[in-house]
Amino acid sequence: MINEIKQDSEKRMKKTIEALHTDMSKIRTGRANASLLDHVMVDYYGSPTPLSQVANITTSDSRTILVTPWEKSMVAAIEKAILNSDLGLNPATAGTAIRVPMPPLTEERRKELIKVVRHEGEQGRVSIRNIRRDANNQLKELVKEKAISEDDERRAAEAIQKLTDRYISEVDAVLAEKEKDLMEI
């Protein structure tokens, strides 16, 4: 029972870290990143389709994303979709390829993004703490039902606390790296 609670907690904490990584990848730094366009939807013959399903997305250098549509007829639709996304990007068509230069971030925008990043990090920490609280409540329930002893509960709570500390430090590391990326010019 105790192991199941620990495993469930660890699985949920891992998912929190994965979600944090996903959220952080959506935040634009000054550097080109192909995953930045993952959430752009293109009108593909009347149905909204993710850009990654109608084109090849690569980074040609640290400041440019290169989008190569699989169908020549999609160039205009892809360009329009990138323009209409809230990413503040201005694509330029060069034949059948679309170059998306990354504009440099202003100091004001960097500070704004750092606030967003810190908020996301805090959400991650809160989520991990909530998972710890749930696990501790489950342990207390088991003690009430006399399924485990108080000593077992204390040992399990300490193990869950170590798990919590490990994942919170992981959140802090992700946060520090994203802040460093944002402050690089």
Swiss-Prot record:
Question: Which is a GO BP term held by this UniProt record?
Answer: cytoplasmic translational termination
Asked whether the UniProt record includes Protein biosynthesis among its keywords, one would answer yes
Q: What are the alphabetically sorted keywords of the record?
A: Cytoplasm, Protein biosynthesis
The protein's superkingdom reads Bacteria
Q: Which terms does the record give in the GO molecular function aspect?
A: ribosomal large subunit binding
The protein's location, in the record's own words, is: Cytoplasm
> Pfam families, from UniProt?
RRF (PF01765)
Gene Ontology cellular component annotations, sorted alphabetically: cytosol
* InterPro entries hit by this protein: Ribosome_recyc_fac, Ribosome_recyc_fac_dom, RRF_sf
* First-listed, main subcellular location of the protein, grouped into a coarse class: cytoplasm
Instruction: Show the disulfide pairing.
Output: none
**Per the similarity annotation, which family is this?**
Belongs to the RRF family.
Role noted for this protein: Responsible for the release of ribosomes from messenger RNA at the termination of protein biosynthesis. May increase the efficiency of translation by recycling ribosomes from one round of translation to another.
HAMAP family from the entry?
A: RRF
Q: What is the name of the protein in this document? A: Ribosome-recycling factor
Source organism (scientific name): Legionella pneumophila subsp. pneumophila (strain Philadelphia 1 / ATCC 33152 / DSM 7513)
